[in-house]
Amino acid sequence: MASSTFFSDWNQLIKPRVTSLVLATIIPGLYLASEQPPSVFLITVTLFGTFLMSSASFIFNQVIERDRDAKMKRTSNRPIPSERISIPQATLVGISMMGLSFYMLTVYVNLLTALCALTALISYVFLYTIFLKPRTTQNIVIGGVAGCVGPLIGYAAIGNSLPIQAWILFTMIFLWTPAHFWALAIFLKEDYSDANFPMLPVVKGINQTTKSIFFYTILYSLSCVSFYFLEPSMGLLYLVIVLLVCIWMGILSYRLIQNPERQAARKFFLFSIFHLFLINITIVVDHMI
């Protein structure tokens, strides 16, 4: 039982399921940046190094937000506010993960890749968690930069450069992020209100939030389609799949305006995760065939 609790607690701290989506956004860059497929070793080190850096950022986030987490029903049982893991212990593990990640990526990949990963951590911890999240409804719009760095890491790992295609994929995720997290904020509105986080549904109301979700969904969909025209290796497979899933995502966001209920927001939230996974997988598959 103690062993099960130990692994469960650290699993909550490092959030591997969330990190898996970040890792998925790295893979297109690994394949698009070179005509030759990347080595298994390079893929493994890049993904594992990023996993460590992402895990460290989530640990630091929960150390900083421990008092607010204690006020939220969804997060009150996390290991730090419930005191199953101490602040010094979590901080030490976070620093160790961050240091090991930077070392691995610098030595076995390149310095640019390590700096991209470290920039993501710094922006998530300092820009988003400390500065923006407690202060503005636009916290996730600006602070979401941290979650967009995956494509930069992928391209940097292979080519030691950041070409325009990397920034296009960065922009796609940047436009995906607000709609995704505002949908989450709708069905967790009371929790965020209890913790005094100025999330958009709390401050502006759900109706305004659903309109903003629709707006960003359209921008995100347009960016997905534009990648077909800006990346020469993309073929009809990518275009067809993108059109289908973007149309459906647009329909879901419009339905959310008409029916701004928690269940509809949750449905959009879950589909947005599937959408981003599918887009990144499709990019790789289309490039390889």
Curated annotation (Swiss-Prot):
It catalyses: heme b + (2E,6E)-farnesyl diphosphate + H2O = Fe(II)-heme o + diphosphate. One of its GO terms (cellular component) is plasma membrane. Gene3D superfamilies: UbiA prenyltransferase. Pathway: Porphyrin-containing compound metabolism; heme O biosynthesis; heme O from protoheme: step 1/1. GO terms for biological process: heme O biosynthetic process. It is an enzyme of class 2 (transferase). Its main location: membrane. The chain crosses the membrane at residues 13-33, 40-60, 85-105, 111-131, 139-159, 168-188, 212-232, 234-254, 269-289. Keywords: Cell inner membrane, Cell membrane, Heme biosynthesis, Membrane, Transferase, Transmembrane, Transmembrane helix. It is a multi-pass membrane protein. Its EC number is 2.5.1.141. It is found in: Cell inner membrane. One of its GO terms (molecular function) is protoheme IX farnesyltransferase activity. Carbon 2 of the heme B porphyrin ring is defined according to the Fischer nomenclature. Converts heme B (protoheme IX) to heme O by substitution of the vinyl group on carbon 2 of heme B porphyrin ring with a hydroxyethyl farnesyl side group. Belongs to the UbiA prenyltransferase family. Protoheme IX farnesyltransferase subfamily. NCBIfam families: cyoE_ctaB, PRK04375.1-2. This is Protoheme IX farnesyltransferase. It comes from Leptospira borgpetersenii serovar Hardjo-bovis (strain JB197).
